[in-house]
A protein has these predicted regions:
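C-terminal transmembrane module of polytopic alpha-helical membrane proteins
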Residues: 1-21, 86, 116-127, 177-248
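Alpha-helical transmembrane segments of multi-pass membrane proteins
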Residues: 17-33
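Juxtamembrane/interfacial segments flanking transmembrane helices
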Residues: 29-32, 150-160, 211-220
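Extracytosolic (periplasmic/ER-lumenal) interhelical loops and adjacent juxtamembrane/interface segments
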Residues: 31-57, 124
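Transmembrane helix-loop-helix
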Residues: 52-148, 182-197
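Structural signal for the C-terminal ends of transmembrane alpha-helices
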Residues: 74, 78-79, 147-152, 204-213
């Protein structure tokens, strides 16, 4: 099966698997890779510049990694065939960064007031304990793109005996994440709004790819110098370069 996968999809699966295995090996030696490569709140002392990229390749366990990579393997090849490898990789990374940006905003709204009420030592300890890992934002972005580009593809989902259109599936997942984010349970440690961030940035990127050139052309036309147009009665030829000569 791996042989038939396009290159970026295959390499994403391999990299995520290697990172998960590395986290297990390092944990046996007392090193928590998820802490160093996972995403921290931007004001935390353990936040590093590489974390917005590395966090999306780390996972909390086999199940977390398996289901994310299963989704990449299911939907990624169709997108990579449609867009090409370069554009698919850009999309994957941008949606992953979209998850990171939204999660940082959520922390700023929810965590920052708590940190401000604590003494500096306790605030620093709490900030460093909050970590986000996983490729779920990129996966939700991939799901959105598949439903956008192939809306009428029918899919079977576990525990649902009838096929569902890809577009409908995207809407269902988005609503589930939205409601779960608005009314989280006390034991819920899933970054639901961050998942929606992957979808939002995926939507923006797809719209830019589809309509960006048209927008840029219209924007350039606003500032392009206008030339005089002169029309004769017998036709509508554009005489922008017509030269007038005084009679001798």
């Amino acid at each position: 099966m791996m042989r038939n996968l396009p290159p970026i999809t295959k390499n994403l699966l391999i990299i995520n698997l290697i990172c998960w295995l590395a986290s297990i090996v390092f944990e046996r030696y007392g090193v928590d890779l998820n802490h160093y490569l996972g995403l921290h709140y931007i004001t935390a002392s353990d936040f590093y510049f590489w974390q917005p990229f590395t966090y999306m390749f780390m996972h909390a366990g086999f199940t977390h990694m398996f289901f994310n990579m299963f989704a990449v393997m299911m939907f990624g090849p169709a997108l990579e065939e449609h867009w090409g490898s370069k554009r698919f990789l850009i999309y994957y990374l941008i949606t992953g960064l979209g998850e990171e940006i939204v999660q940082e905003c959520v922390w700023a709204l929810q965590l920052q007031p708590v940190l401000a009420s604590l003494d500096p030592v306790m605030a620093s300890k709490l900030a460093n304990r909050v970590v986000t890992i996983g490729a779920s934002g990129a996966v939700f972005g991939i799901l959105l793109a598949f439903g956008w580009l192939f809306p009428d593809v029918r899919m079977f989902i576990m525990f649902i005996p009838i096929p569902i259109r890809a577009r409908t599936l995207v809407i269902i997942y988005a609503l589930i994440e939205l409601f779960a984010g608005l009314a989280p349970s006390s034991s819920d440690n899933v970054a639901h709004f961050a998942h929606l961030g992957g979808m939002i940035f995926g939507c923006i990127l797809i719209l830019w790819w589809q309509y960006g050139d048209r927008f840029k052309n219209k924007w350039r036309d606003l500032f392009r110098p206008r030339h005089p147009r002169i029309k004769r009665d017998d036709d509508s030829v554009d005489y922008r370069d017509y030269h007038y000569h005084e009679p001798l």
